[in-house]
Amino acid sequence: VGQPYMNNLLDKIFFRSQNLNYIKFGFRNIKKNTEVKQIFNAIHSFSKNSEIRYVGGCVRKIINRETVDDIDLAVNLKPKDVCDALNKKNIKYYESGIEHGTITALIDNTKFEITSLRKDVDTDGRHANVEFSDNWKEDASRRDFTINAIYADIEGSLFDPFDGKKDLENGKVNFIGDIEVRIKEDYLRVLRYIRFFLNYSK
């Protein structure tokens, strides 16, 4: 029996390519991390409507079955509310980029970047003036690539409005929206595209 046949058989047995079970398994492994639990609990306990999801590199790595070495999080709370939520649970943090909605929580020397949902008001080719939002699709729309706009809740259920998972699995690095417009918003996206292409293209 050849190796391709065995790989296909293993895929079928363990659902590795047919559904999202392996993704949920990956996020449930992260969930075992005490520090991660503390962050999620702090946000969820702040209000009945507060939501927090994984985003960015850690989601891509789980989908690609790679080791997760850092965790970025997105929340539907404004930065001040994130600070209040962390304070209530005695979690240390610093305002690493609060003008852009980013708070860095620090637990046992482990850093977690927590960023509020945003929408761009205007851009100048490098920086954007933002407003904070509670709309996940709106936040996803301002991101550069489809593979950078995949979110996952603590159980591993994906919010993937631009089919980034499919692009990631197919080795595609696609811009969200009009390429020319997105590059004019931030010219460094050209360099980011090259880096992502080298890392993820097939």
Question: Residue locations for each model-derived region?
Answer:
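Catalytic cores of the polymerase beta-like nucleotidyltransferase superfamily
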Residues: G2-K202
